[in-house]
Amino acid sequence: MKTQVLALFVLCVLFCLAESRTTLNKRNDIEKRIECKCEGDAPDLSHMTGTVYFSCKGGDGSWSKCNTYTAVADCCHQA
């Protein structure tokens, strides 16, 4: 009985890890695929301006959101 419970637990953990990896890959694909524009400027990859992120980086106010694609994907630019 304990072996069966342990096997079921391991299967659940493996499923969760696989699902997390799939979700991460989908997010990375969106970041690579979507180019956004902030204030009419074309994307500037050297400063990551116009790149879609799932949250604008920098709690210090160095990044700000200029457009929203979905509830979780934002177009960000350096302030």
From Swiss-Prot:
User: What is the native source organism of this protein?
Assistant: Calliactis parasitica (Sea anemone)
Please list the residues that make up the propeptide. 21-31
Family matches, as InterPro entries? Myo_ane_neurotoxin_sf
Please give the name of this protein. Delta-hormotoxin-Cpt1b
One Pfam family name is Toxin_4
- Keywords on record: Cleavage on pair of basic residues, Disulfide bond, Ion channel impairing toxin, Nematocyst, Neurotoxin, Secreted, Signal, Toxin, Voltage-gated sodium channel impairing toxin
Asked if the record carries the keyword Plastid, the reply is: no
Q: Name one GO molecular function term.
A: toxin activity
> Where is it located?
Secreted; Nematocyst
Carries keyword Secreted? yes
Q: What does this protein do?
A: In neuromuscular preparation of crustaceans, the toxin increased neurotransmitter release, causing repetitive firing of the axons. May affect sodium channels (Nav).
Q: What is its main location?
A: secreted
One cellular component term (GO) for this entry is:
nematocyst
The family annotation for this protein states:
Belongs to the sea anemone sodium channel inhibitory toxin family.
The region annotated as signal peptide is 1-20
Q: Which cysteine pairs are covalently linked by disulfides here?
A: C36-C75, C38-C66, C56-C76
